[in-house]
Amino acid sequence: MLKPXGDRVVLKIEEKEQTVGGFVLAGSAQEKTKTAQVVATGQGVRTLNGDLVAPSVKTGDRVLVEAHAGLDVKDGDEKYIIVGEANILAIIEE
């Protein structure tokens, strides 16, 4: 299993038509974003004075992420992307 460092997040992209709260996203919005599930998170980032700031997402969250963000990786047969937390646009609450 992949364990990201810092503020990075491992995501599993959902390969289906994107909806948010039951609304289908317009075609142009789908081209700019992807829906994904958080698989793993890094420990967070440290502030200038050394305090650790935990990620705002957690394993299992569904998120909206920039379409071209991140790095494609494989772990066995599974495909994931690793993104910085700043590339996550929103948490999708069901």
UniProtKB/Swiss-Prot annotation:
Which NCBIfam families does UniProt cross-reference here? PRK00364.1-4
Subunit structure, interactors included: Heptamer of 7 subunits arranged in a ring. Interacts with the chaperonin GroEL.
| Protein name according to UniProt | Co-chaperonin GroES
Going by the UniProt record, its keywords in alphabetical order are: Chaperone, Cytoplasm
Which InterPro entries does the record associate with it? Chaperonin_GroES (IPR020818), Chaperonin_GroES_sf (IPR037124), GroES-like_sf (IPR011032)
UniProt-listed Gene3D superfamilies? GroES chaperonin
Functional note:
Together with the chaperonin GroEL, plays an essential role in assisting protein folding. The GroEL-GroES system forms a nano-cage that allows encapsulation of the non-native substrate proteins and provides a physical environment optimized to promote and accelerate protein folding. GroES binds to the apical surface of the GroEL ring, thereby capping the opening of the GroEL channel.
**PANTHER family, alphabetized:** 10 KDA HEAT SHOCK PROTEIN (PTHR10772), CO-CHAPERONIN GROES (PTHR10772:SF58)
**GO BP field:** chaperone cofactor-dependent protein refolding
Q: Where in the cell is it found?
A: Cytoplasm
Annotated Pfam families: Cpn10
The uppermost taxa in this organism's lineage are: Bacteria, Bacillati, Bacillota, Bacilli, Lactobacillales
Q: Which organism is it from?
A: Streptococcus pneumoniae serotype 19F (strain G54)
Q: Where are the transmembrane segments?
A: none
Main localization of the protein?
Answer: cytoplasm
